[in-house]
């Protein structure tokens, strides 16, 4: 069900970026709302077009990008930092290693091996993922650092992402 004042759940259409959302208009504390064009979550920036990146930097006055992916994921599909002049990049991996169904670094074959070795049911595996992300040492450090960056921000917009813009970025 749509949230009043938050049309289309903040979806921003881009050419190469998927699942990009402006949190502006979302209800906040004391009846207030999040300011538009300040908090943006997205999937990986690797496939963004040059026009997408120019829009983020110019139209949104992008000050920083927070990347919740693992080092393996960042190495495999790096952010196009060289095309985003003036933007500060923060690498805050929210997971200490590969996590089946979330990370995209090891590949399908490794995911299947990991899944086969898991002793609990698939339902238990999925149910335990979000608490693991938030309560694991890596997650606590990543999300604490993320909030500190936002609180110390200079008024520009901040974008945070993982691979798909759902799990790790959705918790952000």
Residue ranges and their predicted role:
Residues 1-159, 172:
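Cys-dependent protein tyrosine phosphatase-like superfamily
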Residues 163-169:
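Ser/Thr-glycine-rich phosphate-binding loops at phosphate-binding pockets of nucleotides
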